[in-house]
């Protein structure tokens, strides 16, 4: 759709400034559509629209925060939000720009790692799990995070 708008000449519908404003708004809406409001990572809709039927080789991992309900019940929902944010920041530090972290909902994330061989994939998942376990949740020094991770390579 954005490409179609860019193809319009200055005489059609609006001037070039108006067209640029429209393109900017559409980009902003697209960003909102595909981003999780709490964590800022991609959301389930992004996965369903952009990734699910992709035909590239990659590693795909599920990351699930262990005992998330307990964190919320013990420390409050703010602490749960901070735990999710800590996981996102930790995973992002461990991954490449081409990798995609997607929040499927609640405490479940999907990590898509394009062009990843088995040895590096396994090492990367272990690194992520270890880094999350060592991570400090800001404002909650007694909270220790643990995640369950499982993955598969696609061909």
Give the predicted meaning of each segment.
Residues 59-64, 101:
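Active-site-flanking beta-strand signature of metal-NTP-handling nucleotidyl enzymes
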């Amino acid at each position: 759709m954005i490409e179609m708008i860019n193809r319009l000449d200055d005489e059609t519908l609006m001037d070039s400034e108006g067209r640029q404003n429209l393109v900017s708004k559409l980009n902003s809406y697209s960003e909102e559509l595909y981003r999780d409001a709490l964590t800022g990572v991609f959301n389930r809709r992004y996965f369903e629209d952009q990734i699910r039927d992709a035909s590239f080789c990659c590693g795909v991992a599920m990351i699930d925060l262990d005992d998330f309900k307990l964190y919320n019940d013990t420390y409050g929902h703010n602490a749960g939000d901070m735990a999710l944010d800590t996981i996102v920041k930790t995973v992002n530090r461990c991954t490449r720009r081409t990798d995609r972290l997607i929040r499927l909902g609640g405490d479940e994330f999907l990590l898509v790692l394009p062009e990843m061989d088995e040895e590096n994939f396994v090492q990367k998942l272990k690194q992520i799990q270890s880094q999350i376990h060592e991570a400090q949740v800001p404002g909650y020094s007694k909270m220790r995070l643990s995640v369950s991770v499982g993955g598969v390579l696609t061909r």
